[in-house]
Amino acid sequence: MKYPLVFKDLHIEDYERVIEVTCEEVQLHAVIAIHQTLVGPALGGVRAFSYDSFDDALTDVLRLSKGMTYKAVLSGTGTGGGKSVIILPKGMTRPTEDILRAFGQAVDSLNGQYIAAEDMGVSVSDINIINQETPWVCGIESVSGDPSIYTAHGVFLCIKETAEQLWGSSSLKGRKIGIQGLGSVGRKLLHSLFFAGAELYVSDTNQAVLDEVTKFYGVTVVPVNAFPTLECDIFVPCAFGGVINRSNVYNLRCRAVVGAANNQLENPSLGAVLHAQGILYAPDYLANAGGLLNVALAVGKAYCPKTVLQKVSQLPLILKEIYQQSENTDQDTVILSDSIVEEKLTAYI
């Protein structure tokens, strides 16, 4: 079935292309943001969420797509940066098959400029449905599978590197670690941290998930609003972005922030505030790059899990270099990581 799609180009400065896509017939309302394709096709996840307003959705997709550029360049995927959001109608918690198929046709119309993958609110099985309408997807079950496994592993390795920087040992035994959000990545990360001997404090809005992890991992459940100011060794944000903001940044009681969430800082300038307080911050687009590496290394080539694992294992080495530069120059890690990316991008201009 061919869906009657309506396209509207939104002219946004510093973005190659931003397109609003609608199809009233199936209630599709989406935005595809292509930040840059200098390095390769714009690769990024599809997020489905019931936003309060279109402006909220646009702000989210613009920040996320730019973050994908930085994530791709710093981790060396050979891809560009893009992202998309499906704005779910009020009361809808998951995209319907028609919405996914219509969205797939929208992606297909871009002829490979944007390659879609799973993200919050969109499962691997949803990507399989989108794949029925376009070949421009990655992370499907028959090829590279669920990328959250590699996202969680990359964050875990970066947490261990952060422990090494803080205490001279990568051991997490007895370390108090707070995980905010137990979605597909957060739960896998919790599993690794449990077996590493960490003392775990968790929050989530899903009571069933909390009951399950309490039973099987013996975690301590804290209220959602306990983060990010909960006293702990390492705070691990794995839910929405902007969790660290002007109203709470001076009240953090952790030694480090290392998480899977995108855009953890409401504003990049808060990196300097964390640095001034002696709080180590692992740039989010580096720590959570494992999932992107998993799907990107299947684009245009045969998928090899050992190659993916090797690339993900390099993330803490990059983080170590950034931490050391931060200590040597007294600059915050956000400025340093951004400057590394921007320097690499100039080589393509």
Question: Language-model features: where?
Answer:
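Rossmann-like adenosine-cofactor binding region
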Residues: 207-282, 287
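A short glycine/serine-rich beta->alpha loop
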Residues: 139-148, 280-281, 327-329
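N-terminal ligand-binding/catalytic initiation module
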Residues: 1-142
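Flexible, glycine/charged-enriched surface loops at secondary-structure junctions
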Residues: 72-77, 113-118, 167-175, 326-338
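Glycine-rich phosphate/diphosphate-binding loop of Rossmann-like nucleotide-binding domains
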Residues: 146-234
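Adenosine-phosphate binding glycine-rich loop
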Residues: 163, 255-349
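Buried hydrophobic packing segments
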Residues: 61-64, 155-163, 292-296
